[in-house]
């Protein structure tokens, strides 16, 4: 896989200067972008409702994690949508479908979803986009992929703490990069490790 160091924001600027013909992008990549957009849109809505459920059950710290992840997934969805629209592809409105259960079950569902995205879905999408030199899609996919890996670890940790009765020891603050959705627990560096966005612009969930 080629190393992609360009920032998403810079890529958008380049697109304005030299628009891309959507006919030059393969159907497989546009289909993957559509699927990723649908998945991230659903995850964002689902996690927002999971956060409300966690609050009702008295798990304030887990609610914060769900809120942070929801914002991150919304950013991923917007990035995928931006690439599709730049390519001249119509993006249909998504009506998310999911079921809210207990916080424990919701965490298990989140772990399953993040596990699929970080081990199967995004690696496959990235491989295809890389082979097709679909650089903008590749950047957007990589942002989501690396963030979902972090979300998977955070959710697994939260479930472990919940099962052991230590939920209150979880982090009480999360930072989310508005450019790529990268999520930091407790504290964050001066700049995002993925997009190099300044910490001053990060979303804070506490």
Task: Say what each PLM segment does.
Residues 1-22:
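N-terminal export/membrane-targeting signals
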Residues 21-206:
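Non-heme di-metal
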């Amino acid at each position: 896989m080629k190393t992609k160091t360009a920032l998403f924001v810079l890529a958008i600027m380049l697109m304005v200067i030299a628009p891309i013909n959507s006919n030059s992008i393969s159907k497989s990549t546009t289909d993957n972008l559509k699927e990723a957009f649908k998945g991230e849109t659903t995850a964002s809505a689902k996690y927002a409702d999971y956060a409300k459920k966690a609050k009702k059950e008295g798990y304030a710290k887990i609610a914060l994690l769900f809120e942070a992840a929801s914002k991150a997934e919304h950013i991923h969805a917007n990035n995928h949508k931006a690439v599709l629209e730049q390519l001249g592809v119509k993006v249909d409105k998504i009506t998310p479908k999911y079921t809210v259960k207990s916080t424990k079950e919701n965490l298990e569902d989140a772990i399953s979803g993040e596990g699929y995205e970080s081990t199967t879905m995004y690696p496959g999408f990235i491989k295809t986009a890389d082979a097709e030199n679909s650089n903008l899609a590749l950047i957007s996919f990589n942002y989501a992929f690396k963030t979902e890996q972090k979300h998977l670890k955070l959710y697994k940790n939260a479930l472990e703490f919940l099962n052991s009765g230590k939920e209150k020891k979880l982090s009480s603050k999360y930072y989310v990069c508005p450019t790529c959705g990268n999520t930091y627990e407790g504290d964050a560096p001066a700049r995002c490790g993925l997009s190099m966005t300044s910490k001053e612009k990060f979303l804070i969930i506490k």
